[in-house]
From Swiss-Prot:
Gene3D superfamilies: 5' to 3' exonuclease, C-terminal subdomain, DNA helicase RuvA subunit, C-terminal domain, Nucleic acid-binding proteins. The gene is ruvA. CDD domains: UBA_RuvA_C. Pfam families: HHH_5, RuvA_C, RuvA_N. This is Holliday junction branch migration complex subunit RuvA.
């Protein structure tokens, strides 16, 4: 089983993205593929879940561990498969979904593709009260993007090793995030220029 993949995002299609990792392209189904567009041709970290069936081996990808945890909880419900779970995650505000489950809001739950009244009731029965305050509430892809930018992470670690404080680096991190696709060295040079201003 895989926990996550670090690789270059090389392709986006309506239902999948492709991550190139050491010359192998991994086809990964994700909730909102085009939300990954800003990270095209950059190194990303994507959390994955592998589903092995008789006729296929499939990878499902997530922005963060919370989104993956939500997916795993959803597929544990009878009547919800991996594709339905991804559709629910794509269509939902995760916090609203969790509140609907905890408050037995069947009407809200039946608005999702493939979720009828019976499945919604099963979701409430199986999942109500099983989410902690942080356990499965997702964050947006843009919030998670810096975690997926390995070159930027390496640059920040290198600057900290050189003695720069985390508070100093936090001030310029947003500006650096806007410069997608740079190497670690280029991020370091850019950071030093920003701190000299």
């Amino acid at each position: 089983m895989f926990e996550y993949l670090n690789g270059k995002l090389v392709k986006i299609s309506p239902t999948n993205i492709v991550i190139d990792l050491s010359g192998i392209g991994y086809l990964i189904s994700v909730a909102n593929p085009y939300a990954w567009s800003a990270l095209m041709n950059t190194e990303v970290k994507i959390y994955v879940h592998q589903v092995i069936r008789e006729d296929a081996h499939s990878l499902y990808g997530f922005v963060n561990e919370s989104e993956k945890a939500l997916f795993l909880r959803l597929i544990s419900v009878s009547g919800i498969g991996p594709k339905s779970a991804l559709a629910i995650i794509a269509a939902a505000d995760n916090e609203g979904l969790i509140n609907a489950i905890d408050n037995s809001d069947i009407k809200y739950l039946t608005k999702f593709p493939g979720v009828g009244k019976k499945t919604a009731m099963q979701m409430v029965l199986d999942l109500a009260g099983k989410f902690d305050a942080t356990g499965a509430v997702g964050i947006s892809l843009l919030d998670a993007a810096p975690a997926g930018n390995l070159a930027l992470e390496e640059a920040i670690e290198a600057l900290q090793a050189l003695g720069y404080k985390a508070t100093e680096l936090k001030k310029i991190e947003k500006k650096l995030e806007q410069e997608a696709g740079l190497t670690s060295e280029e991020y370091i040079k850019s950071a030093l220029k920003l701190m000299m201003k």
